[in-house]
């Protein structure tokens, strides 16, 4: 269906891809993996035509259509949710008009035996078949099913898209993409803004999809459940494994062991050859042999091996100072923001050593409860009491903003590290993807993802006894997540984690608190015990179990009406937040254009220009910073407006 032939992508003197070839077949389910910066997103952009290779070619089956979901995109703000989603059927609407026109024309003809009449019938049949393939006759039901599957409520359908936060807007774009039914989906981190329920629904959708799927994800469970083939990008090459991710990990370890053996043998041969050359370089009787050995080294194809995996590093949190047995006591706690009721009736106790997951749809109150325990928010109902001698380490989405921008990456850790751990700072930074010259970068030039990883690395150096981690794995690759998970499992303190990553939570937590329909429910077991209890196997079951709650929920939140002044203040705040989001979006659009200009420039460049690359990296860092600000502003807007 799509053939990539000898693709090379070079930027000045640096080669990202070196003669990569790959064939994507109809109905393939491919997971694209590799270290951050290996070129996974670039490969998707090449396939979709947003970027051109330095050399090589990409060929497509004539009928191939592509549906591409990048990591960041924005939705128009001039329509309702349903109207925006229905844009997925633009081609269907054109077909409807063509079918109506052809039907009228055929009805008016009487030349039943003519070739023109036969041609009209043929075109009508083709248009009708295509209409059915694209789901034209079931589009309203498909829109509803897809939006519900991705976590929207029926009460959201007529809301303006401008009222939704950044994460929910990404879901709108994903819904449109799924409804277009292209020949192949190219999905870049599709689970980033989804909760566990929506991820499971998307898994089922993709497993049963009639086309091909090529996706990038750091969610191991998602990859295992969707893909049957894994392509690894490493050192400019593509390694194709006809197996799901977990099996690929085993085969990759075997391949790496073989590579290392070959690499070490070659290094020994090179060392002996260089010793011979140095020893006999100036002896006339050996000159022919010396020249022969020099040519041998020049012709030698050097074996490259990717840096050693860091997942085996034994990185630990410092021992937790002993706290009281009761770490936190939550009694009938609840939170509302103006007319927006988030949750109520939370009633549970967190004890020393507990490892707890907070799960549920976005906006149901997981982060709100975390901030209440930390003390950043005061409950509007009930109470929260933190126990004796509890020292909280809190990792949140904006935690990295608290770091000094003028410190280097290494200094940021060195200033809080004490004891023997100071000798291992480079290993710790490496575990969180900071290597080589990265450790000397100033914090202010780091991307949002890099700052988030640095904040987590710093958290691992300080002696807390209660860790509250809000989506800690968002900017991590598989190996970094494994390191963090192992460290948490060995940690002797108390842990509360907000996460939608099932593989990360599996085996790590022993209690799950689900935020749903304005309440909090406790499950005494791990994440898969919770999922089994909830039986989230299909959208039909989710709808059946939740139908009464969905009808009752509006009644519970409508008991307290706002005064005129309160409404006025809320509208004022909403205008301010929407303006902030619009301003940041305009800045992002400008930055995207400048970055795209540099991408084109580098693609055409024949010489390396250090000043251009410096400016390019500064633009990307600013883009990441602005995207982070956009996510924060969108979250505030979501909380204020309500879902």
Question: Where is each model-derived feature located?
Answer:
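Intracellular alpha-helical coupling/juxtamembrane segments of multi-pass membrane proteins
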Residues: 251-276, 280-306
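ABC ATP-binding cassette signature C-motif
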Residues: 1-261, 312, 316-643
């Amino acid at each position: 269906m799509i053939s990539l032939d000898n693709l090379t992508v070079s930027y000045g003197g640096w080669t990202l891809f070196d003669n990569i070839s790959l064939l994507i077949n109809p109905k393939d389910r491919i997971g694209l993996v590799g270290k951050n910066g290996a070129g996974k997103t670039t490969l998707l952009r090449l396939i979709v035509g947003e970027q051109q290779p330095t050399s090589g070619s990409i060929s497509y089956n004539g009928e191939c259509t592509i549906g591409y979901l990048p990591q960041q995109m924005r939705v128009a703000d001039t329509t309702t949710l349903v109207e925006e989603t229905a844009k997925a059927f633009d081609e269907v609407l054109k077909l409807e008009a063509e079918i109506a026109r052809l039907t009228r024309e055929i009805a008016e003809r009487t030349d039943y035996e003519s070739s023109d009449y036969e041609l009209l019938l043929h075109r009508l049949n083709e248009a009708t078949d295509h209409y059915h393939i694209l789901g034209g006759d079931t589009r309203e039901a498909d829109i509803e099913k897809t939006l519900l599957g991705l976590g929207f409520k029926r009460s959201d359908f007529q809301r303006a898209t401008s009222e939704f936060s950044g994460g929910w807007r990404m879901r709108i774009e994903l819904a449109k993409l799924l409804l277009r039914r292209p020949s192949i989906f190219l999905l870049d981190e599709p689970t980033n803004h989804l909760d566990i329920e929506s991820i499971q629904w998307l898994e089922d959708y993709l497993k049963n999809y009639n086309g091909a799927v090529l996706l990038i994800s750091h969610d191991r469970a998602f990859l295992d459940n969707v893909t049957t083939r894994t392509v690894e990008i490493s050192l400019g090459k593509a390694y194709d494994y006809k197996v799901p991710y977990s099996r690929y990990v085993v085969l990759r370890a075997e391949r790496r062991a073989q590579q290392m053996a070959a690499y070490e043998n070659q290094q020994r041969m090179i060392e002996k050859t260089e010793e011979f050359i140095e020893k006999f370089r100036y002896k006339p009787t050996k000159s022919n042999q010396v020249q022969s050995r020099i040519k041998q080294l020049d012709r030698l194809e050097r074996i490259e091996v990717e840096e050693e995996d860091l997942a085996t590093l034994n990185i630990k949190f410092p021992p937790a100072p002993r706290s009281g047995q009761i770490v936190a006591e939550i009694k009938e706690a609840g939170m509302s923001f103006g007319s927006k009721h988030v949750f109520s009736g939370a009633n549970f106790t967190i004890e020393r050593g507990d490892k707890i997951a907070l799960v549920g749809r976005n906006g149901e109150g997981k982060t709100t409860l975390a901030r209440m325990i930390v003390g950043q928010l005061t409950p509007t109902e009930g109470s929260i009491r933190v126990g004796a001698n509890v020292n909280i380490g809190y990792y949140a989405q904006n935690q990295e903003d608290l770091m000094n921008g003028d410190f280097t990456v290494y200094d940021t850790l060195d200033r809080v590290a004490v004891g023997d751990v100071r000798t291992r700072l480079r290993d710790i930074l490496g575990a969180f993807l900071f290597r080589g010259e990265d450790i000397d970068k100033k914090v202010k030039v780091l991307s949002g993802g890099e700052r988030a990883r640095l904040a987590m690395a710093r958290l691992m150096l300080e002696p807390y006894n209660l860790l509250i981690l809000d989506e800690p794995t968002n900017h991590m690759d598989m190996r970094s997540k494994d390191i963090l998970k192992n460290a948490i499992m060995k940690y002797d303190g108390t842990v509360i984690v907000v996460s939608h990553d099932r593989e990360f939570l599996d085996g790590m937590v022993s209690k799950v608190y689900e935020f749903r329909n304005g309440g909090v429910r406790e499950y005494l077991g791990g994440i898969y015990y919770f999922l089994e209890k909830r039986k989230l196997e299909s959208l039909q079951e989710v709808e059946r179990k939740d139908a009464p709650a969905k009808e009752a929920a509006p009644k519970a939140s409508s008991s307290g009406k706002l005064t005129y002044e309160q409404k006025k203040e809320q509208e004022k705040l909403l205008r301010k937040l929407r303006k902030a989001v619009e301003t940041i979006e305009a800045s992002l659009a400008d930055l995207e254009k400048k970055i795209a200009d540099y991408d084109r420039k580098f693609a055409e460049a024949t010489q390396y220009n250090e000043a251009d690359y410096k400016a390019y990296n500064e633009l990307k860092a600013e883009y990441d910073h602005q995207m982070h600000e956009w996510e924060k502003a969108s979250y505030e807007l979501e909380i204020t407006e309500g879902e």
